Design a protein with these regions (language model features):
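PLP-dependent class I/II
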Residues: 1-140
Length: 140
């Protein structure tokens, strides 16, 4: 590349973002994450496991066979028999239990027949949600 020094310098900066790999701050963040302490990561993983166990185990205890999720902060649950589409079931969950889930159909045709829960709330709130579903009579 031939030209004014300031233009060449700007082109070099731009080029690093086009075809020479990841943005430098992203690389530095990745290095920090991979070389930093593991305790915060382990603690967060343990918290997601507690939330997953509260949701999936709670639903199984009331008769809804929801498999454990592994490696994700989301749980995919089959729509129980007799509740129509994933969208219809989500509406029933909101109206009858006050619990929000996402219809699987939002993710394309392969998602139909499932609903998705996010493990973003504390265990206490998840336990309350399971109890609300139980009290609603939707399952069983």
């Amino acid at each position: 590349l031939v030209g004014r020094r300031d233009v060449i310098a700007a082109c070099k900066k731009l080029r690093t973002q086009i075809d020479f790999g990841k943005f430098i701050p992203e690389q530095k963040a990745a290095i920090a994450a991979m070389t930093g302490p593991l305790e915060p990561i382990k603690a967060q993983c343990a918290e997601y496991q507690r939330r997953r166990d509260a949701l999936c185990g709670g639903f199984r205890s009331i008769g809804w066979d929801v498999p454990d999720s592994h490696g994700s902060m989301f749980v995919w649950a089959p729509v129980p028999q007799g509740h129509g589409t994933s969208m219809e079931f989500c509406m029933e969950m909101i109206e009858k239990a006050g619990v929000i889930c996402t219809p699987g159909s939002s993710f394309g045709p392969s998602g139909e027949g499932y609903v998705r829960f996010a493990l973003t709330l504390p265990v206490k709130k998840i336990t309350e949600a399971v109890q609300a579903v139980k009290n609603s009579g939707l399952i069983g």
